A protein has these predicted regions:
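Acidic/negatively charged segments and metal-coordination signatures
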Residues: 276-323
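N-terminal nucleophile
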Residues: 1-288
Length: 323
């Protein structure tokens, strides 16, 4: 199960997710007993989408069922579900409520029992200045990280919005899905560091990169057992509507193809629609440097093999990729 992380303050909302899908299978222990463990199926399955509607911009992520043996694909379903939900009225609040109804209808119709949480984090622009908001719909996760035992037949919707007026600075951190991967001392220290960056309103790339590093540290290497992996994606939604939504990708290995989050625009115009599967690719990996590499200390040699220090090669802070 995916780990989805939401980080927001007055400046931006950041949503992160690892890209692994996995299956629970039986393994043999050294003492001859058997146990169940999560085996990776796909290390590069995108679970993030940017969503723009008439009154809001949000990043969207999901955790839970990704695919089924019958051919259901949650990433594809989410695009069509968001468009169906927003079509009658392209505003965030009614869209989320209709998305809850669609999820109850469609996920409930799948054979078997399937957990799913869909998270939407960003800003409502009907307020001035824009209002930070976090919505999620789920059939197994509630408020305060509460989890229900059996999967519920109907999805529930939840919302957290920025308090106004408030003397306290606004920031929030929330995680969904494989939260057990963060129940260790290193992850708790990482969480405290990220919380400090949020409260101090540090640049978006500093907050995102620290959180991505923490998520990667908690994940298993490619092919290793575990519910989450080290290949991760990110969406950054600025609170200022004139600033572009940006996307990112963190890899634990050299990659010559990089896929970016999906996009849905539903503002009540003829141009409404969705895109999926956008990627950059080197046509000939034998002739081109990798597009993404494992992050290393700034003064170490870059893993791409260029012989240049990481900070002057793939570790340079470049202009963001715009969504």
């Amino acid at each position: 199960m995916t780990l989805v992380m939401v980080l927001a303050n007055n400046d931006q909302a950041i949503i992160l997710a690892d890209r692994r899908t996995s299956q629970q299978r039986e393994i043999m222990l050294p003492d001859g007993r058997t146990s169940l463990a999560r085996h990776p199926v796909d290390e590069e399955y995108n679970k993030l989408t940017s969503f723009v509607c008439a009154d809001a911009r949000v990043g969207v992520g999901f955790t839970g069922v990704a695919t089924t043996p019958t051919g259901f694909n949650t990433a594809k379903w989410l695009l069509t579900a968001l468009m169906e939900a927003a079509r009658p009225s392209p505003y965030l609040q009614p869209t989320v409520e209709r998305l809850r109804e669609i999820a109850t209808r469609d996920i409930g119709a799948l054979p078997g029992e399937h957990r799913l949480t869909v998270v939407l984090a960003g800003y409502l622009h009907s307020d001035a200045p824009p209002l930070g908001c976090l919505y999620w719909i789920s059939n197994f996760e509630g408020l305060g990280a509460k989890r229900y035992g059996p999967v519920r037949p109907a999805f529930e919707s939840y919302v957290i919005t920025q308090d106004r007026p408030s003397p306290e600075p606004f920031y929030l951190m929330q995680v969904y899905g494989s939260i057990g991967a963060l129940k260790n001392r290193a992850s708790q220290e990482d969480g405290a560091a990220v919380r400090h960056l949020l409260a101090q309103r540090r640049p978006a790339h500093a907050i995102r990169d620290k959180a991505l590093a923490a998520l990667s540290r908690a994940g298993a290497p490619s092919g290793g057992l575990g519910g989450i992996g080290r290949q991760c994606g990110s969406i950054v939604v600025p609170s200022e509507p004139s600033e572009p939504i940006t996307t990112g990708y963190l890899s634990d290995e050299n990659r010559w193809q990089v896929e970016f989050p999906n996009q849905v625009v539903m503002v009540g115009a003829d141009t409404d629609g969705a895109t999926m599967g956008t990627y950059f690719r080197a046509e000939d990996p034998t002739e081109a440097p990798p597009l993404a590499v494992r992050k290393v200390p700034r003064n170490h040699a870059c893993p791409c093999g260029s012989g240049i220090k990481y900070k002057r090669c793939h570790g340079r802070v470049l202009p963001p990729i715009r969504s």
